């Protein structure tokens, strides 16, 4: 292994850089370090303080942002000092340790992106089996595997396959990519190419399914949005549907195209951020491994390294603030009642559990997982998330909703929307049924109950995807039948009414269903 003294002669030329270049590089790395630290710290604190946000998907996000936070605290400060002084002054031991730490954190971050892509794949394509495939234990095992996988990719330089040294153009200690082309190729494939392939495959399938669903909805339903003013001056969308195979309504084509663009943009942002931040760095180290150390311009080498650091800035933005629930809680923590109260008054706290939310939020809503989990638990304990089931009749068409409310907003939610929808939680319903039950009921086999429960929930999710594949938080308030399609609409409404089920209780595997009151 090489120390800082091994490259003293080489560093003499780098130290002679002109003043403006030195100042620009130093300012840039300082800004990058501050942004990485603040951005990831905000997401880590938000997820930690709001424990109900730590769904399985968000646990992966927490691990990702926490590792980036470590990078900003344990690695980048020394890069800043080296960039200013134009030399490494912290000794050989810390040089080797910081190089190993940088490679470990960077590798773990890239592999975590692949794990998140797999998580999204199951959440979007197989929502019914998601709680069984992605469990808490498996999530922990996945995170442990990520770090062990990364460690395997970073240890070879300590055992003689390549070396660790201070790079005078990257201004940090890192593996000597130009000395061992074999190790450079191994690290790129083991820690970067594998998660990239996983991301391409998973997000490709996600977009394909979203596009197919959008086409089916577009061909079978014409959506007309009518604006109706409310007392507070805001507008509420009312929707009327009719069966039609033609594109007579221009607005439906706009909605169809916009929804596809919405999913496509989300996926492109995820893939594009990975390629743009890590792509140049991979090209630089590959060129060094094949053609030698001086084959790349020092300026390009520095820029590529700095650009790879910016991936840690993108992660909290894409996987944290892009999530509506996390963003809401973050703003609530920053502005308190000035933001939280208007938010609950202007936006519905119940929203459709749709494919749109699963794709664009990039974090699975914990409510379906909690809903499924409650069906198999023998002990009914209240959680931090008040997950309930309700039926809404506000537009003439009953729609199954999964309540998206936290404990501090439950009471306000019931007051505001008591006239529009009825909501009942699992815990309250279980207590009511226990008090009111005077006649013994015939027991139902747990396997049959779970099958019926899964079938009804699958039908509801299927109807949600067909009605509102990329719906907004506020579901349209009116559904009107267009002239000339009354028979078809009547059949559609009758079919929807068959799906109006309300989970009454879950106790010892006994699941009962009944129609919601219209």
Curated annotation (Swiss-Prot):
Family statement drawn from the similarity comment of this UniProt entry: Belongs to the G-protein coupled receptor 1 family.
CDD domains, per the entry: 7tmA_GPR161 (cd15214)
Subcellular location: Cell projection, Cilium membrane; Cell membrane
Protein name listed in UniProt: G-protein coupled receptor 161
Domain of life the protein comes from: Eukaryota
Residue span of region Disordered: 429-448
One Pfam family it belongs to: 7tm_1
InterPro entries per the UniProt record, alphabetical: GPCR_Rhodpsn, GPCR_Rhodpsn_7TM
Single Gene Ontology BP annotation: adenylate cyclase-activating G protein-coupled receptor signaling pathway
């Amino acid at each position: 292994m090489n120390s800082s003294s091994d490259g003293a002669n080489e560093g003499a030329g780098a130290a002679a850089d002109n003043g403006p270049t030195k100042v620009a590089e130093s300012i840039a790395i300082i800004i990058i370090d501050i942004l990485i630290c603040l951005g990831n710290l905000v997401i880590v604190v938000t997820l930690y303080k709001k424990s109900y946000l730590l769904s399985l998907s968000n646990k992966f996000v927490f691990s990702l942002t926490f590792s980036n936070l470590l990078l900003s605290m344990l690695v980048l400060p020394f890069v800043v000092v080296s960039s200013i002084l134009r030399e490494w002054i912290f000794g050989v031991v810390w040089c080797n340790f910081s190089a190993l730490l940088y490679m470990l954190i960077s590798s773990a971050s890239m592999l975590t992106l692949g794990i998140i892509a797999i998580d999204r794949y199951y959440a979007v394509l197989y929502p019914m089996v998601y709680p069984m495939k992605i469990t808490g234990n498996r999530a922990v095992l996945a995170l442990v595997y990520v770090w062990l996988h990364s460690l395997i990719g970073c240890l070879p330089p300590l055992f003689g396959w390549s070396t660790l040294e201070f790079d005078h153009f990257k201004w940090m200690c890192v593996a000597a990519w130009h000395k061992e082309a074999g190790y450079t190729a191994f690290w790129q494939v083991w820690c970067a190419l594998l998660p990239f392939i996983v991301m391409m495959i998973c997000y490709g399938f996600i977009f394909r399914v979203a596009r197919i669903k959008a086409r089916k909805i577009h061909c079978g339903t014409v959506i007309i949005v009518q604006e109706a003013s409310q007392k507070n001056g805001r507008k509420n969308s009312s929707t009327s549907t009719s069966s039609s195979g033609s594109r007579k309504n221009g607005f439906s084509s706009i909605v169809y195209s916009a929804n596809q663009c919405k999913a496509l943009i989300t996926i492109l942002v995820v893939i594009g951020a990975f390629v743009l931040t890590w792509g140049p760095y991979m090209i630089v180290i590959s060129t060094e491994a094949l053609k030698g150390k001086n084959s790349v311009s020092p300026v390009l080498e520095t820029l590529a390294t700095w650009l790879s650091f910016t991936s840690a800035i993108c992660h909290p933005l894409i996987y944290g603030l892009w999530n509506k629930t996390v963003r809401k809680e973050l703003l609530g923590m920053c502005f308190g009642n000035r933001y939280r109260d208007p938010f609950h008054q202007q936006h519905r706290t119940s929203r459709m559990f749709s494919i749109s939310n699963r794709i664009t939020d990039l974090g699975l809503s914990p409510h379906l997982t909690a809903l499924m989990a409650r069906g198999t638990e023998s002990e009914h304990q209240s959680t931090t998330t008040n997950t309930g089931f309700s039926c809404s009749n506000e537009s003439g068409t009953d729609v199954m909703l999964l309540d998206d409310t936290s404990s501090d907003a439950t009471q306000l939610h019931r007051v505001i929307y008591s006239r529009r929808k009825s909501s009942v939680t699992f815990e309250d319903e279980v207590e009511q049924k226990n008090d009111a039950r005077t006649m013994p009921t015939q027991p139902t086999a747990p396997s049959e109950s779970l099958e019926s429960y899964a079938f009804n929930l699958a039908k509801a999710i299927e109807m949600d995807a067909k009605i509102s594949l990329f719906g907004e938080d506020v579901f349209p308030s009116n559904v009107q039948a267009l002239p000339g399609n009354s028979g078809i609409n009547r059949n559609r409404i009758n079919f929807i009414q068959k799906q109006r089920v309300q989970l009454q209780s879950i106790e010892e595997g006994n699941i009962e269903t009944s129609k919601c009151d219209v």
